[in-house]
Amino acid sequence: MKEQNTLEIDVLQLFRALWKRKLVILLVAIITSSVAFAYSTFVIKPEFTSMTRIYVVNRDQGEKSGLTNQDLQAGSSLVKDYREIILSQDVLEEVVSDLKLDLTPKDLANKIKVTVPVDTRIVSVSVSDRVPEEASRIANSLREVAAQKIISITRVSDVTTLEEARPATSPSSPNIKRSTLIGFLAGVIGTSVIVLILELLDTRVKRPKDIEDTLQMTLLGIVPNLNKLK
């Protein structure tokens, strides 16, 4: 019971230490969030993302009046293959050559993100670049080259364009609000951890109760500080 009470008192003491230094914690949080905001706004160059979407039609589907569950499941599994084709070396090299990009295929691949919604045969291709018009130009060229490659390699009859890429009107990164919030939370958490560590490492006796907790003895009396009474 004694250890439980001591633990409760220690926890309360830690909260008191945090509350006592709340202004310091808040000040550090404001500084770190300001640094994060300034870094995201003035240092990191914004990037724009354009997305194009395609729909792959199986060769056998043209002879049917509609889709079956088996067709949908088979098509969904093939979409993963289409993703690898889109990011293949041949496709990337052709896009770089057609657009005369000052990029290597590996650099271009780092700008591309291919996503496949669950239980669909739709492939979304996103391209990020510092110039919005360049991002849309690369995305549309990639779609055209990849479509021909998919048709020539797999047993599909057509790759239909669902959505052409258009220049983005607002940057996709950096997320200034999120970066500022992360900076604020990092300041609060980091400063709080430092305060707690310093409090736990501080073995000085600050209260009469500390003597009882440390020596496990009952305190009989307190001698006042005469200098403070003058």
From Swiss-Prot:
Record's GO cellular component terms: plasma membrane
GO biological process: capsule polysaccharide biosynthetic process; polysaccharide transport
Compartment list: Cell membrane
Transmembrane segments: 24-44, 181-201
Highest rank taxon of the organism: Bacteria
Role of this protein: Required for CpsD phosphorylation. Involved in the regulation of capsular polysaccharide biosynthesis. May be part of a complex that directs the coordinated polymerization and export to the cell surface of the capsular polysaccharide.
Protein name: Capsular polysaccharide biosynthesis protein CpsC
Originating species: Streptococcus pneumoniae
Lineage of origin: Bacteria, Bacillati, Bacillota, Bacilli, Lactobacillales
